[in-house]
């Protein structure tokens, strides 16, 4: 739903999204999908709680601030709610991004190289937060990574080379992640 397909179709929540116009796609993403980007994509002039509240406000939730506070607590940042992004470390910024993605309680969480620009110690904490938050929310996680050890922590691993699936296997671990 973020990029146009050249062939095939994508079914999500019972809908063929390749046939939807942009307004319908935006509503589907808002209601069913959370996204964590490699580059945190936080709004610099907004505090952590304001950044996390954005998708809740867009969904018309009256409890946007309470939901944002709960999500920040769940990723261990309850004490940093009023801080601006430039007052947070890289790992903290990524945890704010995770909180923003899980706050609306999506069915699917997409994470594109969520630790790509973090050091190894911070990466482990962010991944533990991401996996724990996904499980707690009962969401499926679709994780894009070049880190094979991280991929092995997921329940299902798809290997894609030159745009084609070259391997599809389960790891025996609990979860829907790929």
Q: Where in this protein do the model-derived segments appear?
A:
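ABC family nucleotide-binding domain
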Residues: 1-153, 157-160
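H-loop (His-switch) and adjacent beta-strand-loop-beta switch element
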Residues: 157-169
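ABC-family P-loop ATPase nucleotide-binding domain
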Residues: 166-178
């Amino acid at each position: 739903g973020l990029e146009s397909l050249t062939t095939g179709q994508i079914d999500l929540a019972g809908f063929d999204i390749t046939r939807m116009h942009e307004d319908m796609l935006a509503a589907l993403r808002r209601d069913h999908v959370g996204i964590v980007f490699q580059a945190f994509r936080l709004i610099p002039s907004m505090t952590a709680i304001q950044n996390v509240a954005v998708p809740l406000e867009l969904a018309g939730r009256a409890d946007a601030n309470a939901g944002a506070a709960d999500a920040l607590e769940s990723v261990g940042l309850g004490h940093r709610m009023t801080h601006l992004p430039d007052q947070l470390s890289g790992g903290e910024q990524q945890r704010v991004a995770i909180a923003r993605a899980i706050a609306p309680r999506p069915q699917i969480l997409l994470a594109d190289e969520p630790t790509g620009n973090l050091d190894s110690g911070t990466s482990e904490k962010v991944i533990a937060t991401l996996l724990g938050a996904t499980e707690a929310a009962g969401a499926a996680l679709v994780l894009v990574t070049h880190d094979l050890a991280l991929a092995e922590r997921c329940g299902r691993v798809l290997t894609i080379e030159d745009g084609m699936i070259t391997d599809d296997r389960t790891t025996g671990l609990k979860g829907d992640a790929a």
